[in-house]
Amino acid sequence: MSRSLKKGPFIADHLLKKIEALNAKNEKQVIKTWSRSSTIIPDMVGHTIAVHNGRQHVPVFISDQMVGHKLGEFAPTRTYRGHGSDKKSKR
């Protein structure tokens, strides 16, 4: 279920302040964040945000197509190592 339109998108306050400060200075800098649930807004386009995946910060470059999605969608938390191999075929 989507969020109510009257509430607006969720974005962490500390992240919004950092984005606005960088936009005011016209700088590009990597921003570290643990806020995977923050929605990507148009002000973030062109910035690189390092999103925490539980182990490390994954750098995510924000493009136009990402607006409206959550930051956590672009930093996978699980590593897939493949299914177990068939031991009979190795003999």
From Swiss-Prot:
Q: Name one Pfam family in it.
A: Ribosomal_S19
Taxonomy, superkingdom? Bacteria
Q: Can the keyword Ribosomal protein be found in this entry's annotation? A: yes
This protein's UniProt keywords: Ribonucleoprotein, Ribosomal protein, RNA-binding, rRNA-binding
In terms of PROSITE patterns, this protein maps to: RIBOSOMAL_S19
**A GO biological process this protein is involved in?**
translation
CC terms in the record's Gene Ontology section: cytoplasm; small ribosomal subunit
- Has keyword Metal-binding? no
GO molecular-function annotation terms? rRNA binding; structural constituent of ribosome
- Which InterPro entries does the entry mention? Ribosomal_uS19, Ribosomal_uS19_bac-type, Ribosomal_uS19_CS, Ribosomal_uS19_SF
Under the heading HAMAP family, the entry gives: Ribosomal_uS19 (MF_00531)
What task does this protein carry out?
A: Protein S19 forms a complex with S13 that binds strongly to the 16S ribosomal RNA.
Query: Do you know which PANTHER family this protein is assigned to?
Result: RIBOSOMAL PROTEIN S19P FAMILY MEMBER, SMALL RIBOSOMAL SUBUNIT PROTEIN US19M
Family from the record? Belongs to the universal ribosomal protein uS19 family.
Q: What is this protein called?
A: Small ribosomal subunit protein uS19
Annotated organism of origin? Trichodesmium erythraeum (strain IMS101)
